[in-house]
Amino acid sequence: QAVLYPSIYSILSKSKVRVQELEPVEGAAVPADTKKAEIKEKEHEVITHGLPVPYSSVVQPIVSSVVVNPGVIPAVVPVDAPTPADTKKAEISDNAVVAYHAAISPLSVVSHPVVSPLVHVPQVVYV
């Protein structure tokens, strides 16, 4: 698979997604072997890029999924554990990977260059 560099393509659209992230609390009074963290809601930008396609007289369906800009973040992982009825138990996992995938859709034949959307969707993958 080839790696696509989104910065070389034109931007078709932008949108915002809200996610909850854990942030450590510095200087919190907690026992020595524990860490205190707060869950904070943040906005991330989702960008759709345009992929220019040269003139073509042949039908060339292009379907691909390419990982772009992977990064490692701590994530809250749900845990099946006995808890009181109105509570949920979760653990912090340091090995969750957020991978942005660029999906290239099939293209139809036209007599002029077309633009195919590349949509970057954050996905959490546990390793």
Curated annotation (Swiss-Prot):
The stretches annotated as sequence repeats are 31-39, 84-92
Which positions bear Pyrrolidone carboxylic acid?
A: 1
Q: List S-S links within the chain.
A: none
On whether Membrane is a keyword of this UniProt record, the answer is no
UniProt keyword terms in alphabetical order: Cuticle, Pyrrolidone carboxylic acid, Repeat
Q: Per its UniProt record, what InterPro entries does this chain match?
A: Indigdn_synthA-like
Molecular function, one GO term: structural constituent of cuticle
Please give the superkingdom of this protein's source: Eukaryota
From the Swiss-Prot or TrEMBL record, give the protein name.
Cuticle protein 4
Q: What is the lineage of its organism?
A: Eukaryota, Metazoa, Ecdysozoa, Arthropoda, Hexapoda
